[in-house]
């Protein structure tokens, strides 16, 4: 029994940093930055009072299983750098929140699992944390932001990266930086939850590959029962291929494999030739 406990401890240790970021820990991880001083004031928000700080954006954070936000600050005269560190229930939730706020106006940067920023802003995810940083400084503080961001990312999760399922998506035709994770309401259906997506292009047409994690084969079956009730289809539900005739989203080819439902979705509701190859390739990796 002791040997089993030691083995469990060995495997769990690497994950401790993913669940133990207290406000005091986060503040202690802030690096020294020339000319800037870490403020002694730290604000902490939870699901009950997050609206007090970010108001209209709070519902999306809660949908992504937000747990706690720690707000910290550097000061340099009248200038400041604000860091908001959002802790979520899982790394997938943190990645999902980050991906929902990607902006085409920002540059991608090598911080954490993925990052975006400019001369006054930096946003990234690492472990189960989503971090937003910005400054009111009139000059370019991108270097300072990246120094702070990299130091925090290293402490939160030194090996930060995309969720394991995202790494399995086929490379051919993949649009860079288009990966996302949706906790619920994928393509407008509340029962389509825990969905990983990636955008693709093929022969001038765009589409998404998606993977729904049902948690178990029974979980996927329950999702399909709800979907078939919506589409009024009476197809036999068994593992393998199925065509969902969604009256709002067009025909959606899916493939059920174990705890996963893999599919192809096109915003115009079109069927795209050749996507069945990508569908099968992805399913075989799961």
Q: Can you say where each PLM-predicted feature lies in the sequence?
A:
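Soluble, non-membrane globular domain cores that form compact, hydrophobic packing
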Residues: 18-286
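Bacterial N-terminal signal peptides
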Residues: 7-17
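Positively charged n-region of N-terminal signal peptides that target proteins for export
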Residues: 1-7
């Amino acid at each position: 029994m002791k040997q089993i406990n030691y083995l469990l401890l060995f495997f769990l240790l690497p994950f401790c940093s993913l669940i133990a970021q207290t406000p005091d820990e986060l503040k202690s991880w802030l690096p020294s930055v020339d000319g800037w001083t870490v403020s002694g004031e730290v604000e902490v928000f939870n699901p009950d009072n997050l609206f007090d700080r970010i108001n209209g954006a709070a519902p999306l954070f809660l949908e992504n299983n937000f747990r706690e936000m720690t707000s910290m600050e550097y000061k340099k005269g009248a200038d400041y750098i604000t860091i908001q560190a959002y802790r979520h229930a899982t790394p997938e939730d943190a990645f999902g929140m980050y991906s929902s706020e990607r902006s085409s106006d920002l540059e991608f940067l090598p911080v954490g699992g993925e990052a975006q920023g400019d001369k006054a802003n930096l946003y990234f995810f690492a472990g189960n944390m989503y971090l937003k940083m910005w400054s009111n400084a009139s000059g370019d503080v991108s270097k300072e932001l990246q120094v702070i961001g990299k130091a925090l990312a290293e402490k939160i999760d030194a090996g930060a990266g995309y969720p394991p399922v995202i790494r399995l998506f086929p490379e051919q035709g993949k649009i860079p930086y288009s990966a996302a994770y949706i906790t619920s309401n994928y393509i407008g259906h509340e029962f389509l939850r825990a969905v990983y997506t990636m955008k693709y292009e093929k022969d001038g047409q765009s589409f998404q590959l998606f993977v729904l994690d049902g948690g178990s084969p029974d979980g996927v079956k329950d999702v399909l029962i709800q979907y078939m009730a919506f589409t009024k289809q009476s197809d036999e539900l068994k593992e393998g291929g199925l065509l969902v005739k969604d009256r709002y989203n067009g025909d959606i080819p899916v493939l059920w494999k174990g705890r996963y439902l893999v599919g192809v979705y096109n915003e115009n509701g079109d069927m795209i030739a050749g996507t069945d190859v990508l569908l099968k390739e992805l399913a075989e990796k799961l």
